From Swiss-Prot:
Glycosylation sites: N211, N290, N296, N302, N307, N339, N1366, N1380
Superkingdom of this protein's organism: Eukaryota
Transmembrane segments: 129-146, 153-174, 189-206, 214-235, 250-269, 398-424, 762-779, 788-812, 823-842, 847-865, 884-904, 957-983, 1206-1226, 1239-1260, 1267-1292, 1302-1320, 1334-1356, 1443-1468, 1527-1545, 1554-1577, 1588-1605, 1618-1640, 1654-1677, 1745-1770
Gene: SCN3A
Region entry Disordered, spans: 28-60, 493-528, 587-631, 662-681, 1118-1162, 1949-2000
Source organism phylogeny: Eukaryota, Metazoa, Chordata, Craniata, Vertebrata
Annotated organism of origin: Homo sapiens (Human)
Residues found modified as Phosphoserine: S484, S485, S486, S1501
Localization in the cell: Cell membrane; Basal cell membrane
Ranges occupied by I repeats: 110-455
Catalytic activity field: Na(+)(in) = Na(+)(out)
Protein name from the UniProt record: Sodium channel protein type 3 subunit alpha
Effect on the protein upon substituting E1160K: In FFEVF4; affects voltage-dependent sodium channel activity; increased level of persistent sodium current compared to wild-type channels and increased current activation in response to depolarizing voltage ramps
Amino acid sequence: MAQALLVPPGPESFRLFTRESLAAIEKRAAEEKAKKPKKEQDNDDENKPKPNSDLEAGKNLPFIYGDIPPEMVSEPLEDLDPYYINKKTFIVMNKGKAIFRFSATSALYILTPLNPVRKIAIKILVHSLFSMLIMCTILTNCVFMTLSNPPDWTKNVEYTFTGIYTFESLIKILARGFCLEDFTFLRDPWNWLDFSVIVMAYVTEFVSLGNVSALRTFRVLRALKTISVIPGLKTIVGALIQSVKKLSDVMILTVFCLSVFALIGLQLFMGNLRNKCLQWPPSDSAFETNTTSYFNGTMDSNGTFVNVTMSTFNWKDYIGDDSHFYVLDGQKDPLLCGNGSDAGQCPEGYICVKAGRNPNYGYTSFDTFSWAFLSLFRLMTQDYWENLYQLTLRAAGKTYMIFFVLVIFLGSFYLVNLILAVVAMAYEEQNQATLEEAEQKEAEFQQMLEQLKKQQEEAQAVAAASAASRDFSGIGGLGELLESSSEASKLSSKSAKEWRNRRKKRRQREHLEGNNKGERDSFPKSESEDSVKRSSFLFSMDGNRLTSDKKFCSPHQSLLSIRGSLFSPRRNSKTSIFSFRGRAKDVGSENDFADDEHSTFEDSESRRDSLFVPHRHGERRNSNVSQASMSSRMVPGLPANGKMHSTVDCNGVVSLVGGPSALTSPTGQLPPEGTTTETEVRKRRLSSYQISMEMLEDSSGRQRAVSIASILTNTMEELEESRQKCPPCWYRFANVFLIWDCCDAWLKVKHLVNLIVMDPFVDLAITICIVLNTLFMAMEHYPMTEQFSSVLTVGNLVFTGIFTAEMVLKIIAMDPYYYFQEGWNIFDGIIVSLSLMELGLSNVEGLSVLRSFRLLRVFKLAKSWPTLNMLIKIIGNSVGALGNLTLVLAIIVFIFAVVGMQLFGKSYKECVCKINDDCTLPRWHMNDFFHSFLIVFRVLCGEWIETMWDCMEVAGQTMCLIVFMLVMVIGNLVVLNLFLALLLSSFSSDNLAATDDDNEMNNLQIAVGRMQKGIDYVKNKMRECFQKAFFRKPKVIEIHEGNKIDSCMSNNTGIEISKELNYLRDGNGTTSGVGTGSSVEKYVIDENDYMSFINNPSLTVTVPIAVGESDFENLNTEEFSSESELEESKEKLNATSSSEGSTVDVVLPREGEQAETEPEEDLKPEACFTEGCIKKFPFCQVSTEEGKGKIWWNLRKTCYSIVEHNWFETFIVFMILLSSGALAFEDIYIEQRKTIKTMLEYADKVFTYIFILEMLLKWVAYGFQTYFTNAWCWLDFLIVDVSLVSLVANALGYSELGAIKSLRTLRALRPLRALSRFEGMRVVVNALVGAIPSIMNVLLVCLIFWLIFSIMGVNLFAGKFYHCVNMTTGNMFDISDVNNLSDCQALGKQARWKNVKVNFDNVGAGYLALLQVATFKGWMDIMYAAVDSRDVKLQPVYEENLYMYLYFVIFIIFGSFFTLNLFIGVIIDNFNQQKKKFGGQDIFMTEEQKKYYNAMKKLGSKKPQKPIPRPANKFQGMVFDFVTRQVFDISIMILICLNMVTMMVETDDQGKYMTLVLSRINLVFIVLFTGEFVLKLVSLRHYYFTIGWNIFDFVVVILSIVGMFLAEMIEKYFVSPTLFRVIRLARIGRILRLIKGAKGIRTLLFALMMSLPALFNIGLLLFLVMFIYAIFGMSNFAYVKKEAGIDDMFNFETFGNSMICLFQITTSAGWDGLLAPILNSAPPDCDPDTIHPGSSVKGDCGNPSVGIFFFVSYIIISFLVVVNMYIAVILENFSVATEESAEPLSEDDFEMFYEVWEKFDPDATQFIEFSKLSDFAAALDPPLLIAKPNKVQLIAMDLPMVSGDRIHCLDILFAFTKRVLGESGEMDALRIQMEDRFMASNPSKVSYEPITTTLKRKQEEVSAAIIQRNFRCYLLKQRLKNISSNYNKEAIKGRIDLPIKQDMIIDKLNGNSTPEKTDGSSSTTSPPSYDSVTKPDKEKFEKDKPEKESKGKEVRENQK
């Protein structure tokens, strides 16, 4: 590859394409064709050379090719890619060096490549302006498409657009040709789009087709053309299409699961949602007289009356009239009801009747399969599902909650997250591919450098021979060198014109130089910029190193990490193609950084953090050198006159940083230390070129050397110039005006200011100011007093002043030039300027929004808060990566918005009365572009169903369904999941660990550290004085030789920093060191000394955890009180593994936990008290040897054995469950059930006593120390305390006290005690506890992030949500009646000035509002209020403030998409961390070992089973053969599927005939399945019931038969019997193994199976949380007013109802509705005096604070944490499952092996005869299959044999496995392990002693054969002698030709005795396997024969 690239660089590589070129190509092609025979041409596809990826059409020319000569721009050139050397193509390049490839055949049969017309077309096509023009046209066209009612003149504009598009296509067709050859117009799929758009335009124009607007919508596709024009978008769309392809399996699985659930729904709820409450007809109507006939089933299916006595009452009309149904206020649909006991009941005077249409315009139902499927899809995407849930439960009964639980957990969580998992994996693969490509390119580049180096060496050798040398001194010489190089090779990286300019400049300069030489020496500053640039480039031509002492204009980047890519058009792409590894040593550098190990470019994602952080700098991408490193951290030895010193930023990139006068010239050229004159500099510079001058004499050598130099020079130059973003004049300007160093006095001032401003304490002060300022801003609220608001104003002024002062001082200290080099400073500057601007404009109306900019100050916290920094970085990274994706998303949204507007806009206008009673457009419509956009955005947020109903009602079902489903699937499921995948990928642990920006500790920590140090110092001094005063000899622990110190962890954030800054900085910006508990001593680890970590196992390395998370705590600050404790802590510390760059803090195990985890050797209780106690109170220590002490000790031992006994634990668990269950009975009916109440009271006392007893026993048994150091014991202790307190209070009669009552609610925590007792839940909880620090961190960051939006909301909407409502109707007054507050008050009692419940009146309320918006629940009301708001004290007007929607859109994107998904990221990340910590075995395995290990794991778990013997009876045998065939299985599956289809056809309102037909068909199926059952029973006999699936079939068949006869009865008492048919679908799972194509789906199901145990644990935990919250809810919200989401079925009155509500909120659905009534705190919203019959409670008001806390905490716990754990498990297992399926051997392969084995070993002896082995190997499926002829391979496997020539199954399997996986050293160890496991799982395994092996046996056989043959030969010779003497006599007579005869005899003899005949019989002895029955033995024998002979030969040769 590299050769191919390197051969032609230089101008000669570009050759114009001429007729000769074409002829040459044709000639080459013909030659090649002649060379290759036809066959080979077909076969060669695999090994064909591939086109060079760098020279693909559309890419830019790699700049190794240099410039295109101007005369060749836009001209046809010969193809550069060797791949096309004999293809008819040519290339054209435009000025931007983009490559266009064309076919060299005639376009449209007439235009040859050299035809002038075609040439002009090509010139136009490749010109950059052409694509610009098209792009502008498309954008303008898009703008015109958004007009809903375009004016008439737009018609002409349309024609213009069509004209331009036609012109574009014509040009393309003329230039490229139409469609026959490669690279023609229609060969590019994007052009199909153009073509169809143009054709459509003309068709709609000239042919009048009915619905033109539908066709006009196709114009929207023009927006897609932007994709084809913008290069980056094509790749993203590629990725999207890839992920959609990958989604096919998930889609199939999803559709299948949804169909199954839809069928179940269809059977369960068909027709239920039409049950309504009908008013009893008036008593005098004819209805009363025949009531009975209505309810005795005389209604036919249409609800009309069947022959009843002639009456005037028309039942059909009566139920058809909607006014007779019971409708709740504010609802569109009538109230549903059900006839079950637990279904919804009707009010008095109403009956429950099935009539009318379904809810929501009739679209929500389970009446037909299609509607049921839609309902299920809606459940899966969880959109407004609470509505469906409530309707269904109300109509069918609460028990059906189980159906929803299943669908939500298995359907929704699992399937939706599978989609996410697949998209994420597709993205990950795409990413890997690009990374690999980049690495490959880098390797290629390295290769090229090597080649250049070789060429250079050769050149030098040539040059050395030549004697003459030319004096080469002075810059002029250099100029000439460079000049000649440019002439010799136009390999420059800039265009020729630039070269000319440069040359001109250089000549002028040389001219000047001659005159101004003296001046130049004395004034180095004025050196012309260009020459410096020329000369500053020192590079040694060594492939890996490039030394430069060049200072760049930006301190963050430097030459050493060249971020441009050699061959890719993206200059700033993340993965640079090559990186120069640099070593730079500089005058003032503190350290000599030599880092050749890591390339500076390596992507942070691509490498895990190394354990030895201090050793590496090459970790994160590009980061800023902090300003502190610029000035305050100068090395003490440096004078302040600004000599350079270098800092190494995190990439190992050396940036030269210096004081104010560091820049000695505009580009920062620095003369090396000690050089006085320029000549020296020049000499040094030239010497480093390393190109010997002699060689320049030899012209060819000179040319070559120069071209080498110029290649590199130009590469560098281009780089450097790309770095210098501005023209040189700006640098001169900057030098004069932006760098202030005029006089010494000023420099002193500057130095002083510098010292002050850069001090860490100032940073701390500023941070505190930021926090205070944020608090001040957050204190705004409505209504505010004058005084308060003036305080806030003054505060704002003060803070603005402080920040302005900070900025001014920093500018003085650092110079504007340097100040603005750093991101944070620019950010500060912008904020300060905005604040000042806002002060000036504060009185201007409408500019109050500027105040919101102050909020950005909050982000300054990120500087010192790593997690916030990380979040901003992640958002930054993602936004970078998401740039293109966002564009794609925007295009998709745009297209759908326009499509919606074009298709449905008119319908909304015309049919609006169908969806709105007052015939005005609803808020969500598609009549104009903005509203259309909002609807599409809402669909992306996952809310599609409600807007779709409206659409279907006004514009017809099919179109709406198609459009909405497309938006949903493409936009929401694919693109948004890609978003999430990107987020998760930028969330790799590296980003988490490497939070700090540079290798500096941030100033805050230094400041806090200093304070800590001061405090410690004071403490120590005081302690010393104290000790001197009171004790003579202080007790000091002697620490010997530091060996005990070794293992103690260092203070986590490394605060001890000496003044000389000699601490070590590691990659995380924290100091790594090892020290004692709180001693000041630090072990500074030398970088080169890191090996000691490895060699000294007692040394624990703490890899610091992201700073800031550790809260600067010292990990073990407790003073060690004794040697033993020190030892103990040492052991503990060694046991804990510090997290590796994780977000998990290291938690030291406490003593109690240790007691739990370590197996006890002997049953001895631990010490009662801690050693500290015993020291202070010596009487606590009792001798256990005699007297009372001994009795006490024995008592403790007894207690210990009781407590440790299993039964005790079981009993306690039982008690916990009972006591928790008892809590569930305390609902609102407890007062009426007196007996239960008294029982519960007694039970409560009993439980309390039992728990107290348990606690006392544990105290005695474990001792206080153990008990109180265990977290679970503390939990028990606190819960028992609560019970105890309430018990005592009851006894004293204080039970009615408020405090005691609230304490009683804490009893709800009792179930928590079950946590520690259930292993599964404990695991989950431990994982959660581990994640708490990082979850908290993310929560905090989210709060900060949201704070900004909340304050902004307060600024925008505080007090503006108030409105005036009519008290009687509850409706809002129109603005014509009431305009403001005073108008409303004037109306008196009938009106009320009321606020929206969830509002933005203060920051707290704002948070709640934002949470509702972020979870998309209740957000509509908030948005409507915001959009309608006008101003404080003014009545709102409909959509007055329309663009406020954008505030919410922006918040949803940042606040919801980003921050909420961060939770998933953090939890997944934590999961991986935890797994690394605990499941350590995987980490220490190589990939190879893992493969073997996994294969063995699967292998060990299987063993050969006895197959079901074939019956002896002939008839049974035939049936057996029929039944055990695969075909039989598959046909049964097809029947099952057909059965499903017939079930799908059922509908609620089908006719009688249809019902009859379906029942007959069902009968047929039952007969068929019964037939299957009978056949299997006959053939398999009693073995039938040994297989699980068969039992399943049997049960289903029996149920179906029973169901047929007893259908009515079963339906009455149980569920509909048709459900059993659905269950049959489970059998499809069996068939998946047989279908090769279903591997993907199998993987998905396998992932689900793997996840189940974990999901079960998480489910348990969720249930526990729900249980606790349900009890809490019952005790607090049982009596609230029934409104919004709380009604007679969904409430907190009973335990069941609470659980139903909480399950609904688990997915955050409808929590706003449940919260609304609880927010009613005073009249007139609720009545505090309502009487509740049967209970003593008064009033129905809620408690807002408790309610908000209850719901918000529940949502955070369940929706954000537990449900995300569920997601994390699925993602994790999906990736594991995909890995497994990618492994060479899967479970199925082993299963298949054993299945085939059963046929060859019917008695399960575990042995097989050697003779059968060949057939066995051939009968397997790949990959284990060894096809015939396979004897040689099998013998070569050297399998051990036992007596009787038998081989054990394990040996065979092992050998075959080895063959698949390849040889490996680890096999033997694994083999032994595996045999042990096999023996363990198979006690029946015969222990056998192999007596020989196949290879040995064969050798023996062959040896025998050779002996035999030789002996025969001997016999033969003897006989020949005899025969020949007889023959000789005859020969003389008959002249027989003797030699022929002799041959014949020998043949004859040979034929009689084939030595290997015995072998041939092998195949006949095998049992009737599938193969052996089908092939006649003879054929097999023939096949094996030649093989045997060849084998014999081989072996013979070997033996020789």
